[in-house]
Curated annotation (Swiss-Prot):
Family stated for the protein in its record: Belongs to the multi antimicrobial extrusion (MATE) (TC 2.A.66.1) family.
The protein, known as: Protein DETOXIFICATION 2
Source species of the chain: Arabidopsis thaliana (Mouse-ear cress)
Domain of life: Eukaryota
Membrane topology: Multi-pass membrane protein
GO biological process: xenobiotic detoxification by transmembrane export across the plasma membrane
Xref: CDD domains: MATE_eukaryotic
Length: 476
């Protein structure tokens, strides 16, 4: 039976001793043991829709265009919201586990599911009319038809997200990441088989690719539900406290809404980037290259996001346990891992800059452009990794609202205007747009670093315990 990776600290550790190299080394090991499986889980989840897009691309150009458009639209209007909302559980479940309020972990998780499902109904209404909406916005009717049909079959997947995402945070808060790893990898293999069967063996076309996504995410939700229900590792935490249910829903939205803002504002900016690239002088080239850069950046981002999930878990656990010194060392450990991974992957990308474009295109023009913009992408790796880890700190502490406000300032008041100016007024084209993103990331990283460095960790620990133990007295 899997044991949690988060052993209890029997006593508070002095501030001086926590910063000694031995303590940092111990914390590095603990964070790494959480981060590596979570990065793999994130990759597996990310690959499900990617595989469906790849399979649809082998059907025809029309199907590829429609599926890509639907994937972009559903990510922005639905899946990003689900991913954002459950960030609240990284605060609530993690701190409840640290405070040994085990039954509240289950209550928070069930309240998240109950809150997500009505939101899914609202979003699904929008998805039903995607075809008409896209045509109204000037999209090609045939592409809009494929996108509309594909999105309709993704509605069940949206509801699956409402279930499995809270369960993922439920297990992560307890350090049960190996269960998540096995479940995610099993689901990935299941999806490959089901997608091929529905699309090619049964001839369902692009709709089959969407159905495969829905079936796979529900398969994932069922596996996680069975683990929570039947495994002894969750015996203490799967309970339900009915008296706390309504106050838990209020707390979920209190931290979930700014957490959704934290995630969605970033996701939406990159979709805006692709839209702006279509207005440049050579739209096909610019859109292709920026899409490739975005794909490379997203694939890299799963590594620091795994580190961020680990840091968020360690920070929330230790604050809930009243051990702010170790929580602070967890941040240092996360930053050390960020330095190592960003240096490695930036160097790797820069070394392979002249050939990596061939992974996505046979066009010499595209490959050369990707090589030209790769140094900027290397800098993005560094900045994105830092912001990911610091956002993990924000979720662990419960100040998602500050992170969301920083995102508005960094990306929409600074980054986006700079990118548009450089791309159109200075005629830097795609490079200018990407420079704008980098400026926004730099501002975001700077502001998050200032907030983190000036944080009173003892005060954060007191707030965490008050937040969890005094739920019945109202919101904190």
């Amino acid at each position: 039976m899997e044991e949690p990776f988060l052993p209890r600290d029997e006593q508070l550790v002095s501030c001086k001793s926590t910063w000694q190299s031995g303590q940092v080394t111990v914390e590095l090991k603990k964070v790494s043991r959480l981060a590596a499986p979570m990065a793999t889980v994130t990759i597996a989840q990310y690959l499900l829709p990617v595989i469906s897009v790849m399979v649809a691309g082998h059907i025809g150009e029309l199907e590829l265009a429609g599926v890509a458009l639907a994937t972009s639209f559903t990510n922005v209007s639905g899946f990003s919201i689900m991913f954002g909302l459950v960030g609240a559980l990284e605060t609530l479940c993690g701190q409840a586990y640290g405070a040994e309020q085990y039954e509240k972990i289950g209550t928070y998780t069930y309240s998240a599911m109950a809150s997500n499902i009505p939101i899914c109904f609202i979003i699904s209404i929008l998805w039903i009319y995607i075809e008409k909406l896209l045509i109204t916005l000037g999209q090609e009717p045939d592409i809009s038809r494929v996108a509309g049909s594909y999105s309709l079959w993704l509605v069940p997947a949206l509801f699956a997200h409402a279930i499995f995402l809270p369960l993922t945070r439920f297990l992560l808060a307890q350090g049960l990441v190996i269960s998540l790893l096995y479940s995610a990898m099993t689901t990935l293999l299941f999806h490959i088989a089901v997608c091929w069967t529905l699309v090619f063996a049964l001839g369902l076309g692009s709709n089959g690719a969407a159905i495969a996504i829905s079936l796979s995410f529900w398969f994932y939700a069922v596996i996680l539900s069975c683990h929570v229900r039947f495994f002894s590792s969750c015996e203490k935490t799967r309970g339900f406290v009915s008296n706390d249910f309504m106050s838990s829903i209020k707390q979920y939205f209190q931290y979930g809404v700014p957490s959704a803002g934290l995630i969605c504002l970033e996701w939406w900016l990159f979709e805006l980037l692709i839209l702006c690239s279509g207005l440049l002088p050579n739209p096909k080239l610019e859109t292709s290259v920026l899409s490739i850069c975005l794909t490379i950046g997203t694939l890299h981002y799963v590594i620091p996001s795994g580190v961020a999930a680990a840091v968020s878990t360690r920070v929330s656990n230790k604050l809930g346990a009243g051990n702010p010194q170790v929580a602070r060392v967890s941040v240092l450990a996360g930053l050390c891992l960020w330095l190592v991974e960003s240096a490695f992957f930036s160097t790797l990308l820069f070394t392979c800059r002249n050939i990596i474009g061939y992974t996505f295109s046979n066009s010499k023009e595209v490959v050369d452009y990707v090589a030209d913009i790769s140094p900027l992408l290397c800098l993005s790796f560094i900045l994105d990794g830092l912001t990911a880890v610091l956002n993990g700190v924000a979720r662990g502490c419960g100040w998602q609202h500050i992170g969301a406000l920083i995102n508005v300032v960094a990306y929409y008041l600074v980054g986006a205007p700079v990118g548009v100016y450089l791309a159109f007024s200075r005629e830097w084209n795609g490079k200018g747009l990407w420079c704008g993103v980098m400026v926004g990331s730099a501002v975001q990283a700077t502001l998050l670093a200032i907030v983190t460095a000036s944080m009173n960790w003892k005060e954060q620990a007191e707030k965490a315990r008050k937040r969890i133990i005094s739920t019945e007295n109202g919101l904190v």
